[in-house]
Amino acid sequence: MADKTVKELADMVSKTASAVQQQLVDAGLPARAEGDLVTELEQEKLVTYLKQSHGQEEKRRISLKSKTTSTARVTGSSGKSKSVNVEVRKKKVFEKPDPEKMAEELAAREQAMIESQARAAKDAEDRAATKKKSEERQAATLAAMRASLGSSKKSDDKNDDISTSVVVKKGGKTTIEVKPKDQPKKKVTATKPKVETAVERKAREVREKEEARLREIETETRRTQAEEAQKRTLEQMRKMAGQYTDQPATEVRKDEPLAEGLVGDALEESFEKERREIKRGTSTTSARGRGRRKNQDEREIKNRKNGLRSSQSSQHKFEKPVEKIVYDVEISEQITVSDLAQRMAVKAREVTKLLMKMGEIARESDMIDQATASLIVEEMGHNPVPVSDTKVEDDLQDAVDERSSNVQTRPPVVTIMGHVDHGKTSLLDKIRETKVATGEAGGITQHIGAYHVKTARGVITFLDTPGHAAFSAMRSRGAQATDIVVLVVAADDGMMPQTEEAIDHARAAGTPLIVAINKMDKPSADPDRVLNELTAKEVVSEDWGGDTPMARISAKTGDGIDELLELISLQAELMELEAPLDGPAQGVVIESRLEKGRGPVVSVLVKKGTLKQGDLVLAGEYYGKVRAMTDEHGKRIQSAGPSIPVEILGLPETPAAGSEFLVLTDEKKAREVADFRTNRERERQLERQNAMRLESMFDQMEQGNVSYLNIVLKTDVRGSLEALLAALNELSTDEVKVRVISSGVGPISESDVTLAESSEAVLLGFNVRADATARRKSDSANMDIRYYSVIYGLIDDVKAAMSGMLAPEHREKILGVADVREVFRSSKFGAAAGCMVVEGTIYRNKPIRVLRNDQVIFTGQLQSLRRYKEDVNEVRTGMECGLAVRGYDVEAGDKIEVFEIQEFARTI
């Protein structure tokens, strides 16, 4: 852009010259005539003003884009290479700095430089003042010394007529002047006399004393200067180190001396530098030394900022111990080889080698007994410490503080047991309707399986147990956790297998039994038959002279329910049930499940103490604080006393149903016990695996003949899961085995569908449903998810699937028998036999056997079957025929037996 006149600018922008002149004035430029020149800088200023006036800012950022294209050779999975176009795009942005910001930054830098120079000048003045004070103190000390020396010389002159003076010159040289009385002055040095007179000896002694005093003063002065330098350096290094105290650098040990830390490194270097300067008598160093020391200091400061320590002070050097370390190795009753090696701080293969020398072959994961482990520990030079598996549990019981000072009567816990479909749940529903308030009637959930009701004689807690055969373990736990067992027997059905099992569980637990004969409203009810069957099981009614209370009830009409509750209350009074109200709570886990949005939900029954919200609960292998508590109606509560069922939230996982829970105050103790129980369960699983190793070897040998039905099982509660797992394991046969790949509590998730798809398993849900993500995943994978609410249907479907996997059964059926009467030769078939069909029918295309003297000598097929020179497909009993056996020559008197192989489907 060259210089132009105002007229030329007006022509370029198609405006009048007066308008351009006015714009120049508005832009802050001096007024110009039409013929005056406008420089390039003024033109740029005018353009900038016009852009700003029209709302456009100066473009300060410029973006440059570049694109390069190249070709690369890529080798594919098949080994062939192909060309691929590679395009690389780059973008660079250049931003023009803002003049105002640049001016501000420049002013800030100038201000900082001025302040830095002022601080440097002040520091120089302080150092000069300090140096001046030090020199003044030194001069005063030397003046005092000269004064004392002068007085001593005057006294010596009076005695010896000799004047001696000591002159200290700069640089450290000492000259002694000896002046005899009334003689001209003569300078004599202490090192040049040839003949030492008495006067000279006296002067030498005085000189030596003064030199010693001067050396002491000089040493004291240097020490004072060194201390001051150390103090200054220490203060500077502390200020520097304070900038990095917030960084998580290498932690300095408490027993580490100061010289090994951050400040110590700097102190050592600074002190050494001060010593060298004092020794040389100067405080300056060479330029090369200053540069090298500066670079080293910068590196050290950079390392400290990055959280690093000096290699000389922080690098750990391993020193091999001189003496062997002897450990006290705790050995439980069963321990794995790897755990034993870890406790002795050796590798597992050393333990396995020692076991091989002892004649035992074991892997790292194998279990060994306590005696063998003790021998290994002693052989390796350590001290074995046998530990009982129950020690931790015993210590836990000792740690539980049972304050039984406030003992009160507690409600009885009653378990309803009996055969399936005998009316247990109907009885509980009827009791709920008649004894629970109207507002609470619908608040009982099906899964908790426990609730308490108020009667005229007090509170009664009921537990419900399933009656199916698969739930034997749950019924056993119910009998153990209860005070009274109510056995429900249908009057029209009598004794059943689960009824007898419930009687056995009650006797094994030593629990009193009350019999409730249900369904008395049915016309087919026969209570006398029920009494006879119970008497056969040694359960004799009080009416018949026994000790077992019995009540005849109808869960449908409600008849006899009050009488049953009366019997329960009387039995509870006779038992005198008591429990401490205060102290840590103890009880049993009734059921546990996993709910979406709430996490693990555990139903517990308190047996002792009071359970409060916020208590630390240990249940089985898990522990946690109670975050929330609800009763059987779903209402939030803060505490629960003895014999009260509640649901708690706060445990990390669902504990096993039937496991005991207790409240602890020490979280460390709870963690220790939980870890111990987890390890014990793992050891038990390893024991079971070792016990089944031989069986698994045989299974592997026969693996070609064994089929597996893989199942992924999800249930609503933990008790149902345990019952179904036991029932499915019992279905396994020698040919088809049920293998549960995964099982758990809670809804079916996407991970369950993925696992079932990868393992080709059947996905089963018992009282649970799949979430939306799992349904979409199953639909895309074309996988069927089966839902069940009754255990019968699930077991029957699994049986049907196993039956379909069974190999069909092959049976042989004899269709007909023919006697060979004569053998003749044929040019076409060779040896042909004339036969008489004596039994059944002979078929042409069926397999045959040739019997000679009732022994099978050949098995094959017929080549030809004729009757009167005509080919036929079959010949019936009593008819003659001619036949030829393919690949074998028959003789007269042989028998031809025709048979077929039939397949029959097998079922479990």
Curated annotation (Swiss-Prot):
Locate the compositionally biased regions of type Polar residues.
65-84
Question: What Pfam families has UniProt attached to this entry?
Answer: EF-G_D2, GTP_EFTU, IF-2, IF2_assoc, IF2_N
> Region G5: what ranges?
554-556
Region G3: start-end pairs? 464-467
Q: Where does GTP bind?
A: 418-425, 464-468, 518-521
Q: Which residue ranges traverse the bilayer?
A: none
- Segments for region (G4): 518-521
GO molecular-function terms, A-Z = GTP binding; GTPase activity; translation initiation factor activity
Where in this protein does the record put region G2? 443-447
Q: What is this protein called?
A: Translation initiation factor IF-2
Gene source species: Psychrobacter cryohalolentis (strain ATCC BAA-1226 / DSM 17306 / VKM B-2378 / K5)
